[in-house]
Amino acid sequence: MTVETITPQTPVSLPKTAVICNDFKLDRVNEPARSILEKYSKIPSREILEHVRKIRDEAFAEFPYPCIGRFSFLDLSISQSPKYPEILHRVVNGEKFLDLGCAFGQELRQLVYDGAPSDNLYGSDLHNGLMHLGYDLFRDVSTLKSRFIATNILEGNSDLISQLSGQMNIIYSSLFFHLFDWDQSLVIAKHVLRLLSLQPGSMITGRFVAYRDWNFAKEKLGSTLRFYFDLSSWTQLWKQVEVDTGSKLNIEHWEQSDNMLTDNGIGGYMLCFAITRQ
């Protein structure tokens, strides 16, 4: 196992989306997370729920993100993606995969559980503390060969970019892009593209919370608006990346149901995407 600690050059505070979720109750651990914890991590079935609660409480005390408070890291969204069979096949056959904003590295454990060699997997997050807790959550500190790098992706000279530039065949990012405004997202998108292999078919995929109509959401929510994209602006972002970098990209999108989101009258939904080099 390798976790590289890097101090971000620009201080980054917790996002405004961090709300109080400390009282959220977890009554059971669903599949596929339960099987991974039982069969991969070798945690007795009767101990799984208490084990997960303990790790969540420890993480939430330091990193009070909603996705931690609400145990969303147990959803393992990558397995629900229509791209997952392709991702798994490619990684099993030697391609390199990066989870950007990986938190505990739970999506990496899904891939390993399904047969991917862990030394083809990379994870990155702003907080190395979360990645360290991932070893406690999955009890694999002595067996996992994946490499983790703590970094601020807004920094163009970060170790993540300098060490892995052009090496990643697949980059996955879940519940990440909605934390940033247009200008920040444009910077991040270009930095992520630098990490991606120049080989056609190299792919950036993932999901984030978006609005069906951002202007409508802005009108309804005003200063309490939490997220920054609808489908139109997301597509425009990557069209701008194409212009600025001279890249040719295929942009796909689809919707994914999610337990975190309810119909509150403003049209929030889980926007999934795949950006592929042509």
Curated annotation (Swiss-Prot):
Q: Name one GO molecular function term.
A: methyltransferase activity
What are its GO biological-process terms? methylation; novofumigatonin biosynthetic process
Q: What is its EC number?
A: 2.1.1.-
Signal peptide per UniProt: none
TM region(s), chain numbering: none
Binding, S-adenosyl-L-methionine: 125-126, 152-154
Recorded catalytic reaction(s): these are: chermesin D + S-adenosyl-L-methionine = chermesin D methyl ester + S-adenosyl-L-homocysteine; asnovolin I + S-adenosyl-L-methionine = asnovolin K + S-adenosyl-L-homocysteine
Which top EC class is given? transferase
**Which InterPro entries does this chain map to?**
Meroterpenoid_MTases, SAM-dependent_MTases_sf
Q: Could you tell me the keywords of this UniProt record?
A: Methyltransferase, S-adenosyl-L-methionine, Transferase
Taxonomy, superkingdom: Eukaryota
Q: Pathway, according to UniProt?
A: Secondary metabolite biosynthesis; terpenoid biosynthesis
Q: What happens when the gene is disrupted?
A: Completely abolishes the production of both novofumigatonin and asnovolin A, but accumulates the tetracyclic intermediate asnovolin I.
Which purpose does this protein serve, as stated in its record? Methyltransferase; part of the gene cluster that mediates the biosynthesis of novofumigatonin, a heavily oxygenated meroterpenoid containing a unique orthoester moiety. The first step of the pathway is the synthesis of 3,5-dimethylorsellinic acid (DMOA) by the polyketide synthase nvfA via condensation of one acetyl-CoA starter unit with 3 malonyl-CoA units and 2 methylations. DMOA is then converted to farnesyl-DMOA by the farnesyltransferase nvfB.
Q: Could you say which protein family the record assigns here?
A: Belongs to the class I-like SAM-binding methyltransferase superfamily.
**Subunit notes for this chain?**
Homodimer.
Name the chain's protein.
Asnovolin E/Chermesin D methyltransferase nvfJ
Q: Which organism is it from?
A: Aspergillus novofumigatus (strain IBT 16806)
Q: Which gene encodes it?
A: nvfJ
